[in-house]
Amino acid sequence: LLMVDYINIVERAIIDELRTKYPNASVYAQFPEAAALEFPALILELQASGVDERFIGEGMTFGGSSGKGEIYGLAYRIHIMVERNTSMDVSGTAYKQRRLLNYLMLNVANDINSITFGASDVEVVERHLRNWEDVGYASGLELWGASTSYLVYFKNYRSS
């Protein structure tokens, strides 16, 4: 029996959603090398796997099949970075600097919470987006930024 690659399915769905909604932003699945960083940057960083596991090895159903598994959690850190000269067109208006950061914080939060993970691929049962933290400006780097934590819990169906 081949195991399903649930972690990469969840991560790919988040990355694809961000790339679709923000085609003028650079979306990274990890921190890029400094020389490769392009702005505005949306960085998804997997921080923990197996967070708050529940019902380990118990019976569960997935679609029409039943077997053993658990609720498995992933913890991501999402970073937004905007540099001084970055702008993004929002309904015909150029958003820059702090205004762009504010726009991205609200809309990235809305968009990742609206992802419809394909039920045939992975059954997400719960998710939590924490508040944006470290919101601010680094004057030496001329960067605006913010970070948040995003938790995703899914059924890890292991065997029949």
Where are the regions that the model predicts?
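Charged, amphipathic alpha-helical segments and their flanking helix caps
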Residues: 1-34, 49-160
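Short, well-ordered secondary-structure micro-motifs within conserved domains or adaptor modules
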Residues: 37-48
